[in-house]
């Protein structure tokens, strides 16, 4: 089988310039990208390969975030259930939460935006019956009903972006300042973000593709006090909130917002729940507003003659690609992480873009690429799991991310990825103009509809 070239994106960094050139040839890659924690080398600007630049709309600008603390991104958190054994109950808000990630928001009216609920009866506790002691971080409920369970739902600022925190923990980055997540939806930050994007484009004239990561709200990702993942919901909306946003929502729907619309008894409206009317109203509002703002950024990128690509993950809430609002944004491409065939179909089925790209696993991080690790096995499982989905709904490109120098320490892995790249190109060429045979046997109906297709 003769070798072909193209349709592959590889990562690079300042310390792997010759190796990047070698991998461009060996894997037949035609595009190079930077990643979180890496820099694009000036020496690779004129290789002839397409250049992707990762762009973070909501972080990597701590100076701005610190100067505008009121416009830091927020999320709703619910405490664990606490049982009252007397007429007074104290609940510490930050129990089992990573202290550097979140800061309790007392700037906005807590009696308006927080909620204490008697989970035994399901009723909200009157704001006259609870108070917050900012010194010790406790909510005090008085009078509490003995042996009833209580929770507190509160707003917290995201002082360490969850994705940046994950990357820092996994890679054991030392002396790295936590990146604060700012809220692009708010007025001052919105104007600043458009200027910031233009400055980025002015200084990155060599870039062909702006790889947005992403627009503009992080999926629900919370860490415990030991920096372990405490709660993850890739579809979660709990970090897409602020009083500024919620007041706009209230004006549109004509009823008062409650934190419980998001908290949902602690289930956070996950995929296995039946969503309330209020939560679905909130999603409609968020999708429209996020799409409107994303289109502004995409239009700026097009103005500079570059392609706009969205990474389908991280801060992607409100950008659900199977909904009508997505088509209005005008993106050129979507790239998604390939966990299996279902997650590949999540973006390979997307319409209204010129091409889709699968970022295959393993990511070149030390949690896999370490002494005793077996990245080749993980790569084989990932490729074989996703390959059939490519035949049924083709993607146009594949790629990898992370630290290339780690991958190069595993020659068997490097050789296997060479085979994967070649096999993908053969599959891509052979399936053009064909329609896979499919016997339709099962239809799945759920409350979420097409919004969570393949979810």
Positions of PLM-derived features:
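Polysaccharide-binding and catalytic clefts of secreted carbohydrate-active enzymes
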Residues: 69-328, 346
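Long, solvent-exposed N-terminal ectodomains/accessory regions
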Residues: 14-39, 49, 54, 71
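Proline- and acidic/polar-enriched loop/turn elements at helix boundaries
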Residues: 36, 50-56, 313, 338, ...
């Amino acid at each position: 089988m003769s070798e072909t070239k193209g349709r592959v994106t590889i990562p690079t960094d300042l310390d792997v310039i010759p190796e990047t050139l070698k991998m461009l040839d060996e894997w037949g890659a035609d595009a190079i990208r930077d990643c979180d924690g890496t820099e694009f080398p000036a020496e690779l600007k004129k290789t002839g390969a397409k250049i992707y630049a990762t762009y973070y709309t909501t972080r990597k600008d701590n100076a701005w975030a610190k100067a505008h603390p009121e416009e830091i991104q927020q999320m709703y958190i619910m405490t664990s259930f606490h049982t009252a054994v007397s007429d007074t109950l104290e609940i510490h808000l930050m129990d089992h939460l990573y202290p550097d990630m979140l800061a309790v928001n007392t700037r906005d009216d807590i009696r308006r935006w927080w909620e204490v609920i008697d989970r035994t009866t399901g009723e909200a506790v009157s704001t006259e019956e609870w108070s917050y002691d900012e010194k010790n971080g406790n909510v005090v409920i008085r009078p509490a009903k003995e042996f009833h369970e209580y929770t507190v739902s509160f707003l917290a600022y995201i002082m360490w972006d969850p994705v940046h925190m994950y990357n820092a923990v996994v890679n054991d980055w030392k002396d790295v300042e936590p990146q604060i997540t700012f809220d692009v939806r708010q007025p001052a930050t919105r104007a600043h973000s458009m200027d910031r994007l233009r400055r980025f484009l002015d200084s990155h004239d060599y870039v062909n593709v702006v790889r947005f990561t992403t627009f503009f709200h992080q999926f629900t990702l919370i860490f415990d006090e030991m920096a372990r993942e405490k709660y993850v919901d890739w579809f979660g909306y709990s970090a897409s909130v602020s009083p500024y946003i919620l007041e706009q929502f209230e004006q549109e729907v004509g009823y008062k917002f409650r934190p419980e619309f998001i908290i949902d008894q602690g289930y956070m409206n996950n995929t296995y729940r039946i969503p309330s009317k209020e939560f679905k109203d909130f999603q409609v509002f968020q999708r429209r507003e996020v799409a409107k703002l994303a289109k502004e950024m995409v239009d700026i990128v097009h103005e500079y003659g570059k392609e706009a690509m969205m990474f389908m993950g991280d801060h992607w809430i409100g950008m659900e690609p199977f909904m009508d609002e997505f088509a209005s944004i005008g993106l050129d491409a979507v790239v998604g992480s390939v966990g299996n065939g279902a997650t590949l179909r999540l973006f390979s089925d997307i319409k209204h873009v010129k091409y889709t790209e699968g970022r295959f696993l393993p990511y070149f991080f030390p949690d896999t690429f370490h002494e005793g690790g077996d990245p080749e096995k993980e790569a084989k499982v990932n490729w074989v799991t996703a390959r059939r989905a490519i035949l049924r709904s083709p993607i146009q490109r594949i790629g990898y991310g992370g630290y290339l120098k780690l991958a190069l320490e595993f020659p068997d892995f490097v050789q296997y990825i060479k085979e994967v790249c070649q096999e993908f190109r053969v599959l891509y060429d052979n399936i053009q103009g064909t329609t896979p045979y499919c016997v339709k046997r099962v239809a799945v109906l759920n409350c979420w509809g097409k919004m969570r297709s393949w979810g």
